[in-house]
Amino acid sequence: MTNSGTVGSPYTPVGGSRGFARAEKDFYPTPAVLTEPLIDRFRVHLDGGVWEPACGDGAICKVLAKHGIESVATDLVDRGYGESRRDFLLELKPPAGVDAIVTNPPFSLWRQFAEHALAMDVGLVALLGRLQLLEGKRLSALFQETQLTRVMVSAGRINMLPAGAEDKGHNGMIAWAWFVWQRFRAVHERPSIEWFTPEKGSS
């Protein structure tokens, strides 16, 4: 997750990690234990190619690659992975050869990322975010208007640490969830919720 702007965030630190200062530009690599369950659940929808538009150091893309899933990695900031200086919010269409957008957006731009991703011609959009995003009035309207398909809730609170920080094994302070939209679904179908248990040691 890399913040493509300088908008302030209403909480510190973004990752809910004890003892760490807020990372510059909200850069918190996504733990593999959060990406693996999404692949397990939606593998068939990811095999058509994935765009990761806030790729950071490639944390999500590396897990996709481990499963043989091709991805296009872009980011506004150069973290040594993918194509940098690409502002997702200014992109007009998805790269060729992808049918899904999977990313962990910067918190301060989460709604903008969601709206922009949903305007793209792809079959699936999956955004990682705080479970409490469901509480916000503006986002609740977005979820209803865009027919959110599924919410995958992590049954364990995982630390999302600043890049390079040592994981001391503490439990995280934030409940994480994948918010998933599928283009081809029954009209007016209600969103479903499911839980997954992150498996420690996944890499």
Model-derived segments and their meaning:
Residues M1-S203:
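Class I S-adenosyl-L-methionine-dependent methyltransferase catalytic core
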